[in-house]
Amino acid sequence: MADITVELVSVERMLWSGKASIVTAQTVEGEIGVLPGHEPLLAQLVDNGVVTIRPVDGDKLVAAVQGGFLSISKEKVTILAEYAIWADEVNTAESESHLQADDEISKARAEAELKAVRRKAEA
């Protein structure tokens, strides 16, 4: 089975690097699924999105992302996010409280975190 090299990087840390069978991300143009052999592309990520990675040797990985870019080349997929956190690391109660924040950045971040938690719970 063909696979694709993927890197998920935020401003603060490298979240993941490895081989995957598919990557999905939410861009300003809509959700995109990337399989091996995808045409090169550069896309802007939404401010409250979710990235899903299906590693070739493990369970589905889901991260909340805020802003950034998705870069697809013949060699790899690179997701450069302004902010990213694994769904497993999200404090749901804290994220829900941030939904009421006046700060739009905090609100968007909380929305992304809660979306990631829901997506992770899906089959």
Swiss-Prot record:
Question: Cross-referenced SUPFAM superfamilies, in alphabetical order?
Answer: Epsilon subunit of F1F0-ATP synthase N-terminal domain (SSF51344)
Q: Which GO terms describe its molecular function?
A: ATP binding; proton-transporting ATP synthase activity, rotational mechanism
- What is the protein's membrane topology class? Peripheral membrane protein
Entry annotated with the keyword Cytoplasm:
no
Keywords tagged on the record: ATP synthesis, Cell membrane, CF(1), Hydrogen ion transport, Ion transport, Membrane, Transport
Q: Name one Pfam family in it.
A: ATP-synt_DE_N
An example of a Gene Ontology cellular component annotation for this protein is: plasma membrane
Specify the domain of life of the species encoding this protein.
Bacteria
Name of the molecule in the record: ATP synthase epsilon chain
